[in-house]
């Protein structure tokens, strides 16, 4: 029986993770649930899964739940609560699906405690990949990617010699604005950005998908997970989202992983590896499949991908700067304080003004993240 903590249990990945657990309750057991502020949904999850520990990051939400909850689950709040849940001896695996930078410290503490990681929080590797992967190697724990692209790469690389890899081919849907040019994007609305053509995701990641920043984050994540140079990681726009990623080898052979656009597939694979089990996701019907098309990404229009490559190649503290600026810019766009194209300008300005710290420690990254967020907010509110 695998005992699991789900950090971010009320979000998109978290709720789908719980659906996987429902279907394999003989193999997977929830011991820890954690959410930001959705106390009502968390309470429902507690009543269903009966974990040993539940955490609300928001203290007000915690107080509301504590006032009415009468069960046996221990309730905690705040970052210390998240760390308690991520390091308890009641679990062996942590699903990190907290949004953005907030997932970094609990993930690091979980690794230090020897927990295996099912990673949905790609920002953890973007911001502190060198430190995270080094600690994972020291503790000899596994980091299994939950997102579809890196789960696909993992399967395509499984059992192969990394020295024989020519390219990692990371697929992208192209988002809701595929084929559009800069002029077309000047006045796009939040609602338009949130209309993703193939995937159902949270609001922040859907905006990142529209800007191609999400794919940029995945490029950096791939570099960290598989220790390949950036010139060996290529993004391919594949609008149908049937092929989730591919690996091309030195002999010209390409191995691809295909599947339906259902996040329960990569979640289940990460949690049940090396076993394969029946999944509730719909199987592909090749008789009904028509076209599989591929395009080169337009990085002149969708600058998020180019900015991520630049930040990744510079390394050090630069990916942290890029990520912090992006998170604040996306939040401002969702609140209709800036335009969609302003997101790129804000990220680029933050990167250009930053003097890179080559080998930052974890606390350096927290300080840099805080400073960049403050600077970006000041710029936005002055506009």
Which residues make up each language-model segment?
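Catalytic, metal-anchored helix/loop core of enzyme active sites in primary metabolism
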Residues: 1-383
């Amino acid at each position: 029986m695998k005992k699991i903590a789900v950090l971010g249990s009320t979000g998109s990945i978290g709720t789908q993770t719980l659906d996987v657990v429902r279907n394999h309750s003989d193999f997977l057991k929830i011991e820890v649930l954690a959410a930001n502020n959705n106390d009502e949904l968390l309470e429902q999850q507690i009543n269903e899964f009966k974990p040993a520990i539940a955490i609300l990051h928001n203290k007000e939400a915690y107080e509301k739940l504590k006032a009415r909850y009468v069960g046996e689950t221990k309730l905690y709040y705040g970052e210390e609560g998240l760390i308690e849940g991520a390091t308890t001896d009641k679990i062996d695996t942590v699903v990190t699906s907290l949004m953005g930078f907030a997932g970094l410290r609990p993930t690091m503490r979980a690794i230090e405690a020897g927990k295996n990681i099912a990673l949905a929080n790609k920002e953890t590797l973007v911001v502190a990949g060198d430190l995270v992967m080094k600690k994972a190697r020291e503790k000899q724990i596994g980091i299994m990617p939950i997102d579809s692209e890196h789960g696909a790469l993992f399967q395509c690389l499984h059992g192969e010699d990394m020295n024989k890899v020519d390219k990692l081919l990371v697929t992208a849907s192209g988002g809701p604005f595929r084929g559009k040019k800069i002029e077309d994007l000047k006045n796009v609305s939040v609602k338009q950005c949130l209309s993703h053509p193939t995937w159902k995701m949270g609001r922040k990641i859907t905006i990142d998908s529209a800007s191609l920043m999400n794919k940029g984050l995945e490029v950096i994540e791939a570099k960290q997970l598989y220790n390949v140079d950036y010139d060996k990681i290529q993004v391919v726009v594949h609008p149908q989202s049937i092929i989730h990623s591919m690996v091309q080898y030195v002999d010209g052979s390409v191995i691809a992983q295909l599947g339906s656009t259902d996040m329960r597939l990569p979640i289940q694979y990460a949690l049940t590896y090396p076993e394969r089990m029946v999944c509730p996701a719909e199987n592909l019907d090749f008789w009904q499949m028509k076209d599989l098309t591929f395009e080169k990404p337009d990085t002149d229009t969708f600058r998020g991908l180019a900015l991520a490559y630049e930040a990744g190649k510079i390394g050090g503290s630069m990916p942290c700067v890029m990520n912090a600026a992006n998170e604040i810019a996306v939040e401002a766009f969702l609140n209709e304080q800036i335009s969609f194209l302003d997101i790129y300008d804000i990220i680029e300005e933050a990167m250009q003004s930053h003097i890179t710290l080559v080998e930052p420690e974890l606390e350096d990254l927290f300080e840099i993240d805080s400073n960049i967020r403050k600077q970006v907010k000041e710029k936005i509110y002055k506009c």
